Amino acid sequence: MTDLPYRPCAGIMLIDRQGRAFVGQRMDSTLEAWQMPQGGIDPGEDPLTAATRELWEETGVASDKVELIAAPDREFVYDLPDELIGKVWKGKWRGQRQRWFLFRFLGEDGDIDIATPHPEFRSWRWIDPADLPRLVVPFKRDLYEEVLAAFRPHLGPQIGMEAVPQADRPR
């Protein structure tokens, strides 16, 4: 076990009108791994501000295009595999402790632009939130299961239908 600290981060589950979750395929990986937007919390920055900043930096989605649905009052933690400790984040962190936010996307797909000044994703898509854990790198699967469980009451029995206004639900 390492004495390194955890990196403070914010994570975002962005759902569309059909209750699907946004995922991006990481630019810096050769793996077929996808993830939701996330990133570091700057010193002195509150987690919600970090989440909306990261969402903008990674997807081009501005804060006026989202509505906050839920924000669990807890942190979610994962450890890097031993072979990655010391190799990522300049060797400063053992993993991440994350605050997660569930946002409803109010915009259109054209409002999403992953070709940002410092791109993180090479492609993106909307998926059923239930598929999230199987699409991420193995060391983040437990965290994604926990995040999904925390947001499930807001996603409804069909994973998302409760969060979608009745008029916008697929027929």
Give the label of every model feature segment.
Residues 130-171:
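Charged phosphate-binding loop/patch that engages nucleotide di/tri-phosphates or the phosphate backbone
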Residues 1-21, 40-43:
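Conserved N-terminal beta-strand and adjoining loop/helix that marks the start
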Residues 35-36:
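A short gly/proline-enriched turn/hairpin at secondary-structure junctions
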Residues 6, 47, 140, 144:
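Hydrophobic (often cysteine-bearing) scaffold residues that line and stabilize catalytic clefts
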Residues 18, 27, 130:
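Anionic group-transfer/hydrolysis microenvironments
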